Amino acid sequence: MISLVSFLIVISICVISHEGGHYLSARWRNVLIHEFSFGMGPSLWSRQKGETLWSLRAFPIGGVVKLEGEDSSEEDPKPEGYDPARSLSSKKPWERLLVLASGATVNLILAWLLTAALLAGHGIMDLDRPLVGKVMEGTPAFSAGIQPGDVIKSINGKELNKWSDIRETIQDKDVTDDIFQITLQRGGRMIGVDVDIPADPAHGGRLLGVQPGRITYPIHTALRKSLGYSWDMGVEILKGLWMVLTRKVQSDVVGPVGIAVMAGDALKQGIWSFIAFLGVINLHLGLLNLLPFPALDGGRIIFILAEMATGKKVPEKWEALIHYGGVMILISLIILVTGKDIIRLFFR
């Protein structure tokens, strides 16, 4: 149940943000909006408000803002006094580009803001210093009296500068003695402790039993740092996608069922974990929608860029046919990955 609720929260925020971006930019450029729908499939509820039909559909796996002139294969009723200049296809290339890119842009902005909120409200592990944030009970560190807030200055005389130095030092294969001489900075004084850290092959070697501290940032700093984190994560997402497409790594793509399970797991771990997950999903959604694939926003943008470069517009019927093919492929992929999710969850 928690997975279903979590999934509905995640997909609602992502889809409404994405389609809201299209809607607002279309309104700004005076494009006729026939429908704003959340979900796919048969309509469960709808209400006409002005020129736009607002609807809720059966399957919460997406949404649509239906614009006049976006797909020439469909004929929608026009309001009384309709002006053909309100068709998306009649707008200038930069206006069409703006409307198409605005959905993914809103997802990327939301990912940036959610990451900034995480950095400001919860913080991230401080890996730049050997500062102890938590000591696990029943571990060598706990038995030796190491406390949260201690800074591990050295181990066996080796000075430590960052968190990873702790693991590297105690995992040194050249060290055979289980007794480690650790120097701590506690407040304004230095403390020396001898810690018995026996080898533990089950956990990959010696385990001290400490976790790093967390560092939070003022909101202005969090907003700036979030840009860097989001950029780095986006690059890794695109690298991973490229490696999957070139078969350098095995595909581990998940569909709606897999996302629901992951959303539920994130919420069980706490609100900050859920916010982090929501940010990552928005980043994925924004980037994937900008890929130059037919039917995706990025695929439609490619046609506009080609028009801007050549001065010639691709015939609408041909563009519509290409996007229709893209839709069929995407639907097939959704069915495929959903089937894989179900097999992975219930039959393995």
Functional labels for PLM-detected ranges:
Residues 2-80, 291-310:
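Small-residue-rich helix-interface/hinge motifs
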Residues 3-7, 91-100, 273-277:
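Residue-level signature of transmembrane alpha-helical entry/exit and packing/kink sites
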Residues 11-15, 66, 107, 111, ...:
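Alpha-helical transmembrane segments of multi-pass membrane proteins
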Residues 45-48, 131-134, 219, 305-321:
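Membrane interface segments of multi-pass transport proteins and intramembrane proteases
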Residues 71-94, 102, 106-257, 261:
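PDZ peptide-recognition modules
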Residues 177, 312-333:
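Multi-pass membrane catalytic core of lipid/isoprenoid biosynthesis enzymes
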Residues 243-247, 281-296:
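Transmembrane alpha-helix interface/packing and boundary motifs in multi-pass membrane proteins
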Residues 336-348:
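Juxtamembrane boundary at the C-terminal end of a transmembrane helix
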